[in-house]
């Protein structure tokens, strides 16, 4: 595993690079069960018919991933983000359970805004990393990757620890069109 510190869009974090050895179970078993579905984010995606920002069809991801080495670039939120996320989430749940739908709705909007900042930081680091390129993915630089990103709210141990899994299908790495 490799880790680097990042900052961007006014939000810091850590990016960890791991290799997928579980046939994507660590993300796909959570999709639409206790975590949202994935989102196509890599700059090479449109060349494969994958619209940026569209929901990931898990069957399509599995088919495209077959035979490819898979990298998981995990963006981990900084401590302050984690604390803010946890507080707003708790407040929203309390309002919901108390029957205060208006207050709960406002707090859910706040939570979406918090995640919007996280996604902005995640996109910024993906753009930077593709611009830099990783030799293990391809010798050409800069690169475009096919990436399926998955927002997770908790750690594998169930602790509040927001992070984004960015699954890179390394065999589909292409050279960026530099003008």
Task: Pin down the residues of each PLM region.
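Intrinsically disordered, flexible peripheral segments
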Residues: 1-179
